[in-house]
C-alpha cells in the first residue's frame, strides 16, 4: 500500500497550500466570533485541519495504482454512505431542509464531500479501462449516464443541489479532457441539465425554497429587491464595500455580528473583503490560482508520460476545486444566489476541509511519481 518515490513534495505548491490554509484558519476563527463560542469553533477547525493534514501526508505515501485498483469499491462504499443519511436520527440528520449528514459519536459527516473524490477516482479509472467503449455513441453514453446519475439522484434526494452540480460538471469536464465526442458530451450534459431543471420545477410546485431562491434573486435589481432570499447577498456586498483596499483589520469586521448569516462557512470571502480588503481578496485569489495552475501542469506532465489515470485524477481534482472556488466567489459578489459552497482551504467545516486536503495530498503524489526515477515509473499508472 505504501511506496516511496524518492522525491519530496513540490515545495512551491506545498508552501502555497499551507499559506492559504493558515490564512483561512485565522479568518475562519475571526468570522465565527460574531455568532458562536469562538474558542469552540477554533478548536474544532484546528482538529479538522490536523486530521486533514495527517491524511494528506498519508496520501503522499500511497501510489496511484492503489486508488485505481480500489476505485470502484470506494465509489460503491460512498454511495452506501449517501443512502445512510436517509435513516432516522440519531444516524441521519436534517439541517435547514437538507438531509446531508450522518451523525457519528463526536462529529457530523457529510458523504457528498467524499463523493467528490470518489467520483474523480472512479471516473478516471472508467476512462482508462473503457477508453474505446466510452467513445462509442450509445454504449459510452449509457455507461457515463449511469455513473453520474447514480450519485446525482441520491444527492438531489438529499436536497443538495450544489454538490450535484459540482460533481456532475467535474465528471463532464473529465469526459471532455479524455476526448469524448462533443455530441455524446452534449447528450450527457443535456440529460443532466434537464434532470436538474425538472427537479427544480417539482421543488417549486411543492413549495420548496430552491426555485423561489432562483426566481426571486433575479426578479429585479438587487438593492431594491426586498425579498429575504437576497438578504445574505446584500450583507456580503456591504461587508466587502466596507473593507476598501486594506480592510478594517482582523477581528474588527461588524458584518459577522448577527448581520451576515453563515459568515464562517459559505460567506467567509465577504469577511475576508471586510477585514483584509481588496489586498486580502487578491491574495486568496492569486494564491489559489497558483495552486490550480500548478495542479493542471502536474496533470499535463503525467499525461506526457502516458500515465493517463494519474493525469485524469489530477485534472479532476483541479477542476472540482476550481469550480467550487469560482462559484463561492461569484456567490459572495452577488453574481449568483447563495448556496452551500464552502471556499476550499478557508471555510469552516470538517468534511469539506478534510477531503480537500486529501485531494491535494493525492495531487502532490501525482507530481512526485512524475518526477521519480524512470525505473520506478513503470509501476505507476
Kindly give the residue locations of the regions a language model identified.
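Extended hydrophobic-aromatic, low-complexity segments
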Residues: 248-249, 279-284, 354, 366
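A juxtamembrane structural motif centered on a specific transmembrane helix
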Residues: 1-3, 309, 324-381
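Hydrophobic alpha-helical transmembrane segments of multi-pass inner membrane proteins, especially
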Residues: 14-27, 34-228, 270-331, 358, ...
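Flexible extramembrane loops and terminal tails that flank transmembrane helices
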Residues: 1-13
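Transmembrane helix boundary and interhelical junction motifs in multipass membrane proteins
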Residues: 160-165, 248-253, 263-265, 339, ...
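Short, small-residue-rich loop/turn micro-motifs
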Residues: 32, 240, 244, 333
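TM-adjacent membrane-interface loops and short helices in multi-pass inner/ER membrane proteins
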Residues: 217-265, 279-280
